Amino acid sequence: MSPTESPGTTTLRHRTVLLDEAVDALVWRPDGAYVDGTFGRGGHSRAVLARLGPAGTLVAFDKDPAAIAEAGTIKDARFSIEHASFAEMGDRLAGRGPVAGVLLDLGISSPQIDEAARGFSFRFEGPLDMRMDTTRGITAAEWLAQADEQDIARVIRDYGEERFALQIAKAIVARRRESGDGGALATTSDLAALVAKAVKTREKGQDPATRTFQALRIYINQELEDLERGLKAAYELLQVGGRLVVISFHSLEDRIVKRFMQAHARPERDADPALRRAPLRAADLPQPTMKLLGRFKPGAEEVAGNPRARSAVMRVAEKLGEQSA
């Protein structure tokens, strides 16, 4: 998912990134069962349904109540929606049989950013919420009001790759102490202003709060944990020949996806010390269980029309059968 700015305005509108490429890679059987793990505003789901035959089906997942409401506008018997993280697809789809493909379009969508009340963006004044699912869980403001300095620094460093994480954490705790209440950082503007003061060196073309907001969003929504669980669940659900298509927008996500696919496509004999010393035939070595079908980036035309698509990376893999190696 990627937000984009309309020409001449600061209003964000949603534009599905790598739409045709993702659907082309995903749908290889018009009569197959498919999963869209990140419905968003339905761009991919609608395109998948357009490719499916009468016997094809699509189950979508999303944590965002607004996405669930949008999914309700799709009047198609082949389509259903689950109000849940894609990490739960294994449990939710248990007993339905294998699927022909799973699509994950990671990250945050422009409608989520554009709605100030969600608290995802430092560009809009709003409560510091940041939850994908507003019906459950702790908000970013609530977590910052109770977390200790070490935990705050760790989250900002690990999930935001922010080199000033410790300084920002110290400033947050100091602000909390000075205020005498837990609501010292209640709004997006509160946090953005604090980070701007704590970060002395600015990255060209990037607001100093960018990495901190990303880190908190990822942590509050357990995005990386969900991704790891979701990849495993997707692999288990896929039939032989089934496709796993994942679009990511930052290096933390892409590294997880890359490692997962490569671990299945290129099993290492080095993973077992005993295998390193053993004179083995090729047939005795660990066999690949997925085939890598490529890594794709948006073309120049798409990036020109939607600059924020520049960071998108799509990886595609196919599940192999036991005799495919």
UniProtKB/Swiss-Prot annotation:
It catalyses: cytidine(1402) in 16S rRNA + S-adenosyl-L-methionine = N(4)-methylcytidine(1402) in 16S rRNA + S-adenosyl-L-homocysteine + H(+). Pfam families: Methyltransf_5. The lineage of its organism: Bacteria, Pseudomonadati, Pseudomonadota, Betaproteobacteria, Burkholderiales. The keyword rRNA processing applies. This is Ribosomal RNA small subunit methyltransferase H. GO terms for cellular component: cytoplasm. GO terms for biological process: rRNA base methylation. S-adenosyl-L-methionine binds at residues 42-44, 62, 86, 105, 112. Keywords: Cytoplasm, Methyltransferase, rRNA processing, S-adenosyl-L-methionine, Transferase. It comes from the Bacteria. Signal peptide: none annotated. Belongs to the methyltransferase superfamily. RsmH family. SUPFAM superfamilies: Putative methyltransferase TM0872, insert domain (SSF81799), S-adenosyl-L-methionine-dependent methyltransferases (SSF53335). PANTHER family: 12S RRNA N4-METHYLCYTIDINE METHYLTRANSFERASE, S-ADENOSYL-METHYLTRANSFERASE MRAW. One of its GO terms (molecular function) is rRNA (cytosine-N4-)-methyltransferase activity. Gene3D superfamilies: Putative methyltransferase TM0872, insert domain, Vaccinia Virus protein VP39. It is found in: Cytoplasm. Specifically methylates the N4 position of cytidine in position 1402 (C1402) of 16S rRNA. Its EC number is 2.1.1.199.
